[in-house]
């Protein structure tokens, strides 16, 4: 997979959430739980994925696909509800 992100957004995300957008790409190397974000019209299809960075850190990554490239929009630690969703999904995945 190819990834891209806005460099200014990467800096802001790292300062705010302690996770770089480059680091966030790692979740796609393992099982992820993904759904389409339909909360509002973003003028593009945005997806939300929950996955792990290593064995213990579970994060949420917002992304979109543009011409075959996954553009990372944001990344942050999960909240309690998101961790539960992720764990339930992973247990169901063979």
Describe every region a protein language model picked out.
Residues 1-94:
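Ribonuclease/tRNase effector modules and their secretory precursors
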């Amino acid at each position: 997979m190819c990834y891209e992100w806005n460099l200014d957004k990467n800096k802001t995300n790292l300062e705010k959430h302690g996770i770089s957008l480059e680091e966030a790409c790692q979740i796609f190397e393992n099982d992820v739980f993904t759904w389409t974000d339909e909360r509002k019209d973003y003028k593009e299809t945005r997806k939300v994925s929950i996955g792990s960075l290593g064995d213990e850190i579970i994060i949420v990554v917002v992304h979109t696909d543009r011409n075959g490239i996954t553009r990372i929009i944001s990344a942050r630690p999960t909240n309690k509800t998101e961790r539960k969703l992720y764990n339930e999904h992973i247990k169901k995945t063979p």
